[in-house]
Amino acid sequence: MKPYLLEHEELKELSAKIGGWRIMTNHIEREFNFSNFVEAFSFMTKIALICEKHNHHPNWENVYSKVIIKLSTHDLGGITNLDQTIASEINDIFEK
């Protein structure tokens, strides 16, 4: 998939497509909470595999049972269709 920057109208519609994610100036972000560190780290491991598949990696942090993920496409300087795709796949993992 060749990434392209999302246009203003696409960004406005993005929240409905990837529930739970906040649209920021140059990235999207979401906080995920789990009951313990093992669950949080397991979630991160699953995400790592998706990101490797797309060769697109998040900025993220993990503090005990909380994971915060930020997605953007640095090469293009903003939010792209690839960020949207990965956010959607992350949501699917979280909801399972």
Swiss-Prot record:
Pfam families (UniProt xref): Pterin_4a
Native source species: Prochlorococcus marinus subsp. pastoris (strain CCMP1986 / NIES-2087 / MED4)
GO terms of molecular function: 4-alpha-hydroxytetrahydrobiopterin dehydratase activity
Protein family per UniProt: Belongs to the pterin-4-alpha-carbinolamine dehydratase family.
Alphabetical GO biological process terms: tetrahydrobiopterin biosynthetic process
Class of enzymatic activity (EC top level): lyase
Keyword Lyase annotated: yes
EC number: 4.2.1.96
Record protein name field: Putative pterin-4-alpha-carbinolamine dehydratase
Keywords carried by this UniProt record: Lyase
Membrane-spanning ranges: none
Reactions catalysed according to its record: (4aS,6R)-4a-hydroxy-L-erythro-5,6,7,8-tetrahydrobiopterin = (6R)-L-erythro-6,7-dihydrobiopterin + H2O
Signal peptide bounds: none
InterPro entries documented for this protein: PCD_sf, Pterin_deHydtase
